[in-house]
Regions:
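Conserved AMP-binding/adenylation subdomain of ANL enzymes
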Residues: 8-23, 30-95
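Gly/Ser/Thr-rich phosphate-binding loop
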Residues: 69-73, 81-151
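Conserved ATP-binding loop and adjacent catalytic segment of the adenylate-forming AMP-binding
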Residues: 50-53, 117-169, 178-181, 191, ...
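Conserved adenylation A10 loop of the ANL superfamily
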Residues: 1
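Phosphate-coordination loops involved in phosphoryl transfer and adenosine-cofactor binding
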Residues: 20-21, 104-105, 196
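Conserved ATP-binding/catalytic segment of the ANL
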Residues: 159-225, 230
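Short acidic amphipathic segments
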Residues: 240-246
Length: 246
């Protein structure tokens, strides 16, 4: 259960230096918290023009039609666009960017899954910033986000101003004004997820001294070897995912 305050705080608690009246092309499902909060509510708060993409099949056409400055994406979309950029690596970067996104385009916000840092470097060559974040629906949804010029490799950004975090037995706990009230009519599940206002994310990770969040895997996915060592399969999957053969 997310309240009006939960969503409003998540959308407005951080000044991300997004120019007012930016044009946003919304390509993710609006019923998902990520799109609802960061495309729609954040866009409203900044006076942005929000253009709704009617189908992923039409995304390229709609980019040319609406000429957005900003888009929210999930890593799978970014990987697909990266192939176009890589295929045109021998052409002038400005020309490729203008053909794929338009000269006015400058920022992609990424969330929902792991993003290979190499893609961030690739898009930078074409004058496009990828700002990665981390969150979950139970947190309305953003927990941390990257700011332009303040990226740390392998990090999923800095904690939102209305959020604090701690690590308990390797698991990341978060607390703040964006954390849900509970699961609707599911008291046992709510009790399991929340402890004195702290939400158990189920993610393994830590926060460094500057407030940057790092994720190392999912608690439920841990593989315990015969000698008692904990192995996170996500590290292996992410490494394999960099191979063009996979």
């Amino acid at each position: 259960m997310l309240t009006h305050r939960n969503l409003a705080e998540n959308a407005t608690c951080l000044d991300m230096n997004i120019p007012e009246k930016s044009v946003v092309l919304s390509v993710l499902p609006i019923h998902h918290a990520y799109c609802l909060c960061m495309d729609i509510l954040k866009g409203f708060s900044l006076g942005s023009t929000i253009c709704i993409n009617d189908s992923l099949i039409h995304m390229a056409k709609n980019i040319k039609l609406f000429q957005p400055n900003i888009m929210l994406m999930v890593p799978l979309m970014i990987e697909s666009l990266a192939k176009k950029l890589q295929a045109a690596k021998d052409l002038p970067a400005e020309l490729v960017k203008e053909n794929v996104f338009g000269a006015q385009f400058h920022t992609i916000f990424s969330g929902g899954a792991y993003l290979n840092p190499d893609y961030i470097t690739l898009f930078e060559r074409f004058g496009i910033s990828i700002l990665q974040g981390y969150g979950m629906t139970e947190c309305s949804p953003v927990i941390s986000t990257t700011m332009a010029g303040k990226q740390k490799k392998q990090s999923v950004g800095m904690l939102m101003p209305n959020c604090e975090a701690k690590t308990v037995d390797g698991e990341l706990y978060v607390r703040g004004s964006s954390v849900m009230q509970g699961y609707y009519k599911m008291p046992e599940e709510t009790k399991e997820a929340l402890s004195d206002g702290w939400l158990k994310t189920g993610d393994l990770g830590y926060v460094d001294e500057e407030g940057y969040v790092y994720l190392t895997g999912r608690k439920k996915n841990l593989i315990i070897t015969k000698n008692g060592e904990n192995v996170s399969p996500e590290e292996i999957e992410n490494k394999l995912g960099t191979s063009p053969l996979v």
